[in-house]
From Swiss-Prot:
A motif ('KMSKS' region) lies at residues 594-598. It comes from Borreliella burgdorferi (strain ATCC 35210 / DSM 4680 / CIP 102532 / B31). Its cofactor is Zn(2+). It holds the Pfam family tRNA-synt_1. IleRS has two distinct active sites: one for aminoacylation and one for editing. The misactivated valine is translocated from the active site to the editing site, which sterically excludes the correctly activated isoleucine. The single editing site contains two valyl binding pockets, one specific for each substrate (Val-AMP or Val-tRNA(Ile)). This is Isoleucine--tRNA ligase. Gene3D superfamilies: HUPs, Isoleucyl-tRNA Synthetase, Domain 1. The gene is ileS. Its EC number is 6.1.1.5.
Length: 1042
């Protein structure tokens, strides 16, 4: 026997009850244990940082990461789900710096690296309990107890093994290179870390500087937007094919050289200068000039202070001449190619000038701009000063401007394996698919060598020891290897401990570790190996869990985790690290901005869950464009709408079934037969079996959008067609076979639908299942197998028939709404136009249903529209414009004059001739735009190949019937307001008026049947509610139980 179900459910409370049920009965653990020994489905969980609380952006991938493993478990596979934590790196260090009130490398070293790392270890798992509570409350099943942490010694050791493998393959090298650098973090960043940050519009000073050509009284006008790089100037670049002009400036009385195209930008008056000569940039190549600062004069003998040609120089901005300093990637490349200059980097770890540039010592580079400009102006080198608005990258962790500078770093040689990376990408199933060739594929095509070292403290140390005497390098791949070489016991692999480990070399020197730590992205990319402590343990099983069958994260990870996984998987095994990936977009606030606590532009996620329930939030996110890697403007109202339009209708269907099943004491049979006689039963069973087929196909393809759409379509069919059209079968008093078939069918449909929905909305499905399950059923809905389609009960013919009837009904309802004809007001006739003979036959079979649904008395089927409308035509300028030219206007006029019969001929395929002047033109249907004019009293609508019309003339008899239907509806509402049971018989009290008399004379039996009224009584004292039957017709009613 089923328990009674309340019409109004408190879904958050239900979810908390279900969480307790899962925990008390260890349902998650049982779901995994029952699949032990089955085919494994491998899932990698990308590790988040636990230094902040989860937000809506985390909820999307976490919902996806719950849906797929639940589904695959129900498909009979063994799916381990262990959570992971990213515990190293810049985010953690930055939090500790804020906590301690210190900043930068020097202050950390003064505080003590060991003390600093202890603080990092304390803070790194600050919010793990909050994460655990929120993720579990979202309904995600994941094992936090067996989760991995990147700071675990076992994890760190496997990362060393990965590093050594790459080192031995020649894929690791150390070099100076111009890299993006965070001054506040005092470390270089990788290119993809730069892309994780924000590019802001900034106003930088734009300078034009005079550089004097050696031994001549002539000046090169050189342009720059980075004044702070000028003290390190080592060269000048021009475009080889750009034309330059040597001019005499009459005002300054100086000879100047600049791009010819830029003369108008620098001189308003052509008479203020004289052109001496014009020449290509190639003529300037090799010319020496006098440096504007004397800090690095010793570099002159190594090729500094000369003009070079470069492809990147243009005349789009500035003068067409730019200065070269080793702070730009292209600049650095040209200096390496054409000179032997030393690597110049007069900046300390925080990007302040060192003593090498004594005039500006101690100044942060951006702050030094003003002083440098003053210096140049004072010494008459400044020709022009302006401001330049451009986009500039800012550090994704500290929000400070990124500085590009030459710095020693360790690299993965990505260029060397680029071809293989592209091959590996072809093996990956991307969802959405466009990312394969698009965002991710393009990123791989342009991939640069990956700077993996960080000049920081809390991270996995680069396992390379270097001989202090010879420079010989030894790369360590395990803890044991280091113990054997050093003769010391190793307890921890972090920098503060491992840097103490040294040993003598045979050459009389000492092996000392290189000071850097690894980029934390290297660790997350090594997660498939390190989380399993491969190859030190689990070596046999590893082949079964690599590559992953599935991963999921946000779009930003195409340049983050997806990228590093792919690089390391390719470098180690020439294989992808994952076979399938679902990529979600960004979750923004409702105003389209980034969600921010300071902006206060979003609701606390737990408040949303506690208001609407986790199921509603999950469904809202999965239904949205965010699952297709598009952005979502999050709205609480969107979650509310999902609750109202999807979750509650599911509950209502369940409530409807249990209400009547309890009344009739329905008990589901042990062997429920799907062979039914009623067409509605056959149809909903067929639709359900078809749905199973779609879901098994689409979820296997990781197409959650199509899966959800199919589920929602079925929910609509179940509620708004099957149940609505079957109500009378449940209402009737006799328990015949048809009624029992209706119970069995609805029971089967709801229970099966819950199992199909279970991976998506795990709470409400469990709640409903617990009331519907029999003694033979599994303890939890999530312990079931995912339903497979029974092809024997898929009946496409009956699906087509009823779906056609539903389409006609939908069109008719739209037409009524458009012309303000209420659905309870009967109409005399519906006209349906289709040329398709099969559709005509199906419509005849469905006539009774269609008439009932649209509240019409008669249905007429036509093959042509002409009986409903007359045609008018306008010229289709898009089509005709291509072929008519100057005759277009005249032909357009003639088209507007076409008669109805002429247009019908064109519709039927006849080519229609129009004469304009001496030319003949022939019109086809594509050349005209049809306009339909309805005939008198008809309202017409067209959708694809079907046109329908309704007779809008409402006779007195029809009007009275419409009022009666509205009268019944108002009585039903009053029953609900008074919490009457659906089976309660009533006395109906009415007042004495002419309208009610007419209604009762004609429709008394109908009113009694629909409202379960045994008696209709005139009694003023019992009247309790005033109701509105039409615009100006009111009456009073009252009801009481018999």
């Amino acid at each position: 026997m089923f328990k009674k179900v309340e019409n109004k459910a408190n879904f958050p409370k239900i979810e908390e009850k279900i969480l307790k049920f899962w925990n008390d009965n260890k349902i998650f653990e049982k779901s995994i244990k029952q699949r032990e020994g089955c085919e494994e489905f491998t899932f990698y969980d990308g590790p988040p940082f636990a230094t902040g609380l989860p937000h809506f952006g985390h909820f999307v991938p976490n919902t996806i990461k719950d849906i797929i493993p639940r589904y695959q478990t129900m498909q009979g596979k063994y799916v381990k789900r262990n959570f992971g934590w990213d515990t190293h790196g810049l985010p953690v260090e930055y939090e500790v710096e804020k906590k301690l009130g210190i900043s930068g490398k020097y202050e950390i070293e003064n505080y003590g690296i060991e003390n600093f790392n202890k603080e990092c270890r304390k803070i790194v798992l600050r919010y793990t309990e909050e994460w655990k509570n929120i993720i579990l409350r979202l309904g995600r099943w994941v094992d936090f107890e067996k989760g991995y942490k990147t700071m675990d010694i076992s994890f760190m050791e496997s990362v060393w093994w990965v590093f050594k493998n790459l080192y031995e393959k020649g894929l690791i090298y150390e070099s100076y290179y111009v890299l993006p650098y965070s001054p506040k973090l005092a470390t270089p960043l990788s290119n993809f870390e730069v892309n994780l940050g924000e590019y802001k519009e900034v106003n930088d000073p734009s300078l034009t500087i005079k550089f004097k050509i050696k031994d001549k009284n002539e000046y090169l006008l050189v342009w720059t937007t980075t004044p702070w790089t000028l003290p390190s100037n080592l060269g000048i670049a021009v475009g080889q094919e750009i034309e330059y002009s040597k001019i005499f400036d009459k005002t300054k009385e100086e000879i100047l050289i600049l791009g010819s195209k830029k003369l108008n930008s620098y001189y308003d008056d052509e008479n203020s200068y004289t052109i001496i000569e014009k020449f290509k940039g190639s003529k300037l190549e090799g010319i020496e000039y006098e440096p504007i600062f004397n800090y690095f004069l010793e570099q002159k003998d190594k090729g500094a202070f000369k003009v070079h040609t470069a492809d990147y120089v243009t005349t789009d901005d500035g003068t067409g001449i730019v200065h070269i300093a080793p702070f730009g990637e292209e600049d650095y490349r040209i200096l390496k190619k054409h000179t032997n200059v030393d690597i110049i980097d007069p900046l300390d770890a925080e990007c302040k000038f060192t003593n090498q540039v004594k005039d500006f010592k101690g100044l942060f580079v951006k702050d030094a701009d003003k002083k440098i400009i003053e210096n140049l102006k004072l010494r008459n080198f400044l020709f022009k000063r302006e401001n330049y608005l451009h986009r500039y990258p800012f550090c994704y962790r500290t929000n400070c401007p990124i500085i590009y500078r030459p710095i020693s770093s360790w690299f993965v040689n990505v260029e060397k394996i680029k071809t293989k990376l592209l091959e590996v990408n072809e093996k990956i199933n991307w969802m959405p698919a466009h990312l394969k060739k698009g965002r991710f594929g393009k990123w791989l095509e342009n991939a640069k060598d990956w700077a993996i070292s960080r000049n920081r403290f809390w991270g996995n140390p680069i396992p390379i020891w270097i001989c202090s005497k010879t420079g010989k390098k030894i790369c360590i791949g395990s803890k044991k290897e280091l113990e054997n070489l050093s003769g010391q016991k190793i307890e921890d692999l972090h920098k503060d401990q491992i840097d103490k480990i040294t040993w003598p070399s045979k050459d009389g020197g000492k092996f000392i570790r290189t000071s850097e730590v690894l980029d934390c992205w290297f660790e997350s990319g090594a997660m498939p190996y390190a989380s399993n402590h491969y190859p030190f343990t689990n070596e046999i099983n590893f082949k079964n869990i690599f590559p992953a069958d599935f991963i999921a994260e946000g779009l930003d990870q195409t340049r983050g985790w997806f990228y590093t996984l792919t690089i390391l998987g390719t470098a180690l095994f020439e294989n992808t690290a994952f076979k399938n990936v679902i990529v979600n977009g960004l979750v923004l606030s409702s105003d389209g901005r980034k969600m921010s606590k300071s902006f206060k532009n979003y609701t606390d996620p737990m408040q949303v869950i506690n208001t609407f329930g986790a199921d509603a939030l999950r469904l809202y996110l999965i239904m949205s464009p965010v699952v297709k890697a598009d952005d979502l403007k999050y709205s609480d109202n969107g979650v509310r709408d999902v609750l109202k339009n999807i979750i509650i209708p599911i509950w209502n269907a369940y409530s409807f079934f249990t209400t009547y099943a309890i009344i009739d004491k329905f008990k589901p049979p042990k062997n429920l037969s799907l062979a039914k006689n009623n067409n509605l039963d056959k149809w909903i069973i067929s639709e359900l079996e078809s749905l199973k087929k779609i879901l098994n196909t689409e979820i296997d393809k990781y197409n959650l959008t199509k899966s959800i759409e199919s589920l929602l379509e079925f929910i609509d069919k179940l509620n708004n067609w099957y149940i609505r059209r079957s109500r009378r079968r449940f209402w009737k008093s006799e328990n015949d076979k048809d009624k029992n078939d209706a119970y069995e069918t609805l029971y089967y449909a709801i229970k099966t639908l819950m199992i199909l929905l279970a991976p998506f909305i795990p709470f409400i499905t469990e709640e409903i299942y617990q009331n519907l399950k029999t003694d033979e059923d599994k303890q939890s809905i999530h312990l079931n197998d995912y339903p497979k389609a029974n092809e024997n009960f898929i009946n496409k013919t009956i699906e087509e028939k009823i779906n056609l009837a539903r389409k006609i009904t939908s069109m008719a309802r739209s037409l009524r709404s458009l012309h303000n004809i209420k659905i309870r007001m009967p109409i005399s006739t519906i006209y349906i136009v289709t040329k398709n003979q099969n559709e005509q036959n199906m419509l005849m079979e469905m006539q009774e249903i269609i008439l009932d649904e649209i509240n019409a008395k008669e249905m007429k089927i036509k093959a042509n529209e002409e009986e409903l409308i007359t045609y008018k035509a306008k010229a289709n300028f898009k089509e005709l414009g291509k072929k008519l030219g100057k005759d277009m206007k005249a032909v357009s006029t003639e088209i507007s004059k076409l008669k109805n019969e002429d247009i019908i001929k064109i519709i039927n395929g006849t080519s229609y001739e129009i004469k304009v002047a001496n030319a003949k033109h022939y019109l086809s249907l594509n050349d005209i735009i049809l306009e339909r004019e309805e005939k008198e009293n008809l309202k017409v609508i067209n959708e694809e190949s079907i046109t329908i019309g309704i007779d809008s003339l409402i006779t007195k008899e029809l009007y009275l019937e419409g009022l009666t239907r509205e009268f019944v509806r108002q009585i039903q509402n009053l029953r609900k307001e008074k919490n009457f049971d659906v089976s309660d018989r009533i006395n109906l009290y009415i007042e004495n008026n002419e309208t009610l008399k007419e209604m009762l004379n004609k429709f008394e039996k109908y009113i009694k049947t629909e409202t379960l009224a045994l008696n209709i009584i005139l009694n003023k004292s019992k009247l309790e509610k005033k109701i509105n039957l039409a615009d100006d017709i009111f009456t009073l009613i009252g009801i009481e139980k018999c």
